[in-house]
Amino acid sequence: MFEGMSFIFDIDGTICPIKKKEESYEDLVPYPEMVEKIRAYKEGGARIIFFTSRNMNSYQGNIGMINANTAKIILAWLDKWKIPYDEIIYGKPWPGHHGFYVDDRTVRPDEFLRLSVEELDELCKKSRCD
């Protein structure tokens, strides 16, 4: 049903809440409706990819430190919550607290949850500059 499709997800603020200072990443609880929909797409044949900037600011963009420290926490967390995936890419550039990601194939988490694949495609087509 979803063969040939890929969904690339951020983790923090998308799959789970953004960690507060007094919290640990291990204790974050994922959004149930997001996990359910990811599972449904994966079961339907879609590729699920996580692309995260977690700890890019903390480690000043040092991917080696992220691989050594952050990756194992994310892998254990995904396993704990049985969140399926095909790939995880670490080191997504972090735009800072006042920056943005601009992309013609971007949808917001709430749009992903409420819209069909066809509606998501139409939404992306409308936002292109061509």
Say what each PLM segment does:
Residues 1-130:
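Catalytic phosphate/metal-binding cores of nucleic-acid and nucleotide-processing enzymes, i.e., regions
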